C-alpha cells in the first residue's frame, strides 16, 4: 500500500469538506472522491462504474452511500458495492488519520515476470 497525504489534519479536512458532502481531488494521477459523513471520511474512485459520471458531482446519504448524479445509483462508501444489487462496484481507498495528517492509500500493483534461461 502506498500512502499519500491529502490534508494536514482531520480538522483541516472537515473545514474543507463539510459534513454530508463530497469533494473531488487528484492524488498521484488519480481522480478520487472524498466523502465526509457522520461516520467519518471515505475515499472512492470518482468515476461511476455504471456509466462513468463523476461521483464528485453527486451527494452522500445518511445511510453512508454516495449517489451518482446521472442515474442516482447508490454505492456503499465502505464496500463500494451498489445498493441496487446490480453488481456494479466503485473502487474504495482506505483513509488513515495520523499525527502529521490525513492519508489515502492505494494498492501497489506489481507484476512479476519469470524467464527461464535457455541452455
Regions found by a protein language model. Give the residues of each.
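N-terminal pre-ligand scaffold of iron-sulfur
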Residues: 1-61, 93-116
Amino acid at each position: 500500500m502506498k500512502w499519500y497525504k491529502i490534508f494536514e489534519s482531520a480538522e483541516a479536512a472537515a473545514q474543507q469538506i463539510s459534513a454530508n458532502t463530497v469533494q473531488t481531488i487528484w492524488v498521484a494521477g488519480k481522480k478520487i472522491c472524498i466523502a465526509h459523513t457522520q461516520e467519518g471520511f471515505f475515499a472512492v474512485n470518482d468515476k461511476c462504474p455504471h456509466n462513468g459520471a463523476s461521483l464528485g458531482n453527486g451527494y452522500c446519504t445518511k445511510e453512508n452511500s454516495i449517489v451518482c448524479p446521472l442515474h442516482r445509483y447508490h454505492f456503499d462508501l465502505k464496500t463500494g458495492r451498489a445498493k441496487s444489487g446490480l453488481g456494479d462496484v466503485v473502487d474504495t481507498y482506505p483513509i488513515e488519520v495520523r499525527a502529521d495528517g490525513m492519508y489515502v492509500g492505494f494498492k501497489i500493483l506489481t507484476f512479476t515476470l519469470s524467464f527461464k534461461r535457455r541452455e
